[in-house]
Amino acid sequence: ITTYLDKPGWLACLTGDFLTQFYYYRYAGPTILTLSILMAGYNVRCGVEDADIKGTWIPYTIAIAVMTMLVCFSLHYDYRLSSIIAIAGGANVFRFSTKILVSTRMFVKKLENQALRHTSIDGTRLPQWITAVSIFISMLVCHWFFGCGMWIYAALVLLGCIKYINKPGNYTRLAAITIPLFIIILDKRLYFIDFHTLYTYPGLGKFVKPQMDLEKTLAADCEYYFGNYNKVVNMIEKDKEPNSYMKFYYNLISAQGRSLPAVLLKYPDNNLGTFETLGPDTPPLTIKTLNELYWILGDMTFCERAAMLANVCSPENRNIRMMKRLAEINLVKGDY
C-alpha cells in the first residue's frame, strides 16, 4: 500500500484501485462507475453552490457538463476510475475547506466582539489572509490526496472570485491559487516523474470514440479466462470480421479440442494459428494472450516470463489476474 505514496493523488488511486477489483463481478463494474460519476457530479454541484452561486441553473448545468465529460472519458479503456475519484475529491476538499473557513471567520468575529472592537470583520484585512492561507493549504493537500483534483478545487475558487469580483481580497485569493502551482514543481524530485504527470496524475482523460473492437477483444479474453469456451466460439463465429486477438482465442480453443486444422483457414490471415511474433514492439495485450498459450502447453518458464512482462509493461499495474497466474506457476513448479 505504501507504493501509492510514490505518486501524487495517492488517496484517489488507492480508492479507485480498491473499487476496480470488484469489476470482477457481473454488473458490479457499471454500477460502481455510474455511482462514481454521479458522486462526482453531486460534489461539483454542491461545490458550485458553496461558491455562493445558488438558486440558479448554473450549478446543475456545470454538474451535468462534468458528468457528461466523465462519461466520454470513460469510453477510453485506459481511463482509470481513480481519475473520477480525484475529481470528486477535489470538489469535496473545496466544500470541506469552505465550511471550515466560514466557521473560522465566525470565531474571529466573536473574538473581536469580545474585545469590544466594533470594526466590522469585513472591514479588516484579517479575513482576507485567513482565506488566502486556507486556499494555499487546501491546494497542497488536495494535490497530495487527489492529484489532478486540485484543478477542480482551483476552478471552484476562481468561480467564487468571479462572483465577488468587486470585493477586496480577490487578488490575494488568486495569488493563493497560483503560488502552490509553482511550489508543486519541487515535488518533481520527490516523485521522480515528469512535469506533465506531476500536474495531471492519475489522468485527465481524453475524448475518444467508443472502442467497440477492443471491447470485443476484452469480452473474448474474459470469457476465455472464466472457462466459457463455447461462449467464446459463438461470439467469434457470429462476428463477420473478428480481429487477430479474437481469432487467436478461437484457434487456442480449437487446438485444445484437436480441431485446429479444420478451422485454420476459416478466416483470412489466420494461417499461423497460435503463432505470434515477439519483439521490442509487441503490445502488452499480445503478451497476455501468449501467457494463456504457454499455460496450456505447460511451459512454465515462458508462462512466468509472459506474466511478469504483462505487469512490467504497464505502469502502476496491479493486475490480480497475472499475480494469480504467477502463484499458479509456483504451485506447478513446486516453488512454495
PLM regions with names:
Residues 1-19, 23-35:
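Membrane-interface coil-to-helix junctions
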Residues 34-52, 89-99:
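Transmembrane-helix motifs of polytopic, lipid-linked glycan transferases
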Residues 48-68, 123:
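Transmembrane-helix signature of polytopic, membrane-embedded enzymes
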Residues 52-53, 101-126:
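Membrane-interfacial, low-structure loops and terminal tails that flank and connect transmembrane helices
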Residues 66-84, 143:
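Aromatic- and kink-enriched transmembrane "portal" helix at the membrane-lumen/periplasm boundary
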Residues 109-110, 123, 131-144:
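Membrane-interface alpha helices of multi-pass inner-membrane proteins
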Residues 139-215:
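Hydrophobic helices that insert into or interface with lipid environments
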Residues 198-336:
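Soluble catalytic regions of membrane-associated enzymes that act on cell-envelope
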